[in-house]
Amino acid sequence: MRMYDIILKKRANVPLTDEEIRFVIDGYVKGDIPDYQVSALLMTIVFNGMSARELGTLTLAMAQSGHMVDLSSIDGITVDKHSTGGVGDKTTLMIGPLVAACGGKVAKMSGRGLGHTGGTIDKMESIPGLKVSLEQDDFIAQVNKIGLAVIGQSEGLAPADKQLYALRDVTGTVDSIPLIASSVMSKKLASGAQAILLDVKVGSGAFMKTLDDARALAKAMVDIGNENGRSVKAVLTDMDRPLGHAIGNALEIREVIDTLKGHGPQDLTHECLIMAAHMLVLSHICDYETALSQVQDALDSGEALERLRLMIEAQGGNIHVINDESLLAIGKFTYDVTAPQDGYITHMNTEQCGIASVMLGAGRTVKDGPIDYSAGIVMHKKTGDSVICGESIATLYASDESLIPNAAKTYVEAITFGTTAPTVVDTILDIVE
């Protein structure tokens, strides 16, 4: 079997066999196939796409290039959730406790912030003492005991994906639905969960800017799951405005706790309840209507908040953050962004809002760079809200006062004002299954 022939075959838009796909991934990881040949194949995939079978095989081969987590010793169906990345997206830390409180088994491996989007692991590390790295046996034992564990992704997961992504990044092959889908799902397959809920963000703060592109990505990822015996569902959610009120790390943990106490923003609460209900359905615990009722009860009764407390305790964190938000760091320098006129906020460039938060220190400007857990933004007004000239629409927080002016300028430029109230869409845009 020759890589040259495989490239020519795919260039002619002839589907590759499972053996050919595995040959490519195995050879590339071992160093037997050079970058320039894999680059050529990637470009043929960009132009010609892949069938559901090809994509399923490619993704499994990528997953099997490294450690495959075995969760079979967890009682019940294990369920995972993945977000394609957004601004103010702290949903994992609400949905996990909601699902666990209703009998689900949430075994979640999460990532760090990427570009303008935040990362669940960064947010969790703003809780004093909390560990985001567990041995596999401890991870499994925790899920069996309290129904929930969230840890950082292992370096050994899907190494082929890491190699391929680095190559795609410099060869103009990042923007491809099949290649994006295989990248995401290779790590999900390797993580071991039997059921996966995908939160595919759409809009100015998402990597998928249009609903059509988001649907295509969602369908590709669901197909990959089906090809590999996983139960997968995708929820398409709006990211034309940040989710909730807080952007940052400790600020978002404060909002998670407030929301699980029943005092959170309506959009965040609504989105989390719906996604948690879908995860219960994927777990074969109950039907959707029953699931909605159960997760609402878990929120109202405080049982979901208790599951968050149990997870923090199990992972070595300070459980007193639940009732004492002063234990969660907040930037000592603040600045209020004010409305320049009476009227409404008619649009938010959500990506720019996320960038403003990064500029305050809440995200990284270089890989593995430092992060300020206390920095970020609390929004008092969002798209569709009425404003009065001079009132605060957002408060910026930073530990370094010199970072505020440029971040404030970026945030101001992200907001559009008008005299007519805009139409605000529901946060849930579509379901793909």
Label the predicted regions.
Residues 1-88, 307-318, 432-433:
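Acidic, glycine/proline-rich low-complexity segments that act as flexible tails and inter-domain linkers
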Residues 5, 10, 15-17, 28, ...:
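Well-ordered secondary-structure scaffolds
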Residues 47, 93-107, 187-192, 227-228, ...:
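Alpha-helix C-terminal capping segments
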Residues 77-100, 104-116:
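Glycine/serine-rich anion-binding loops at beta->alpha junctions
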Residues 92, 110, 117-122, 154, ...:
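Short acidic, glycine/serine/threonine-rich loops at helix termini
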Residues 109, 143, 151-154, 199-203, ...:
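Short beta-strand segments
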Residues 123-149, 219-225, 229:
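A glycine-rich helix N-cap at a beta->alpha junction
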Residues 144-193:
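Phosphate/diphosphate-binding glycine-rich loops and adjacent basic-rich segments that engage nucleotide
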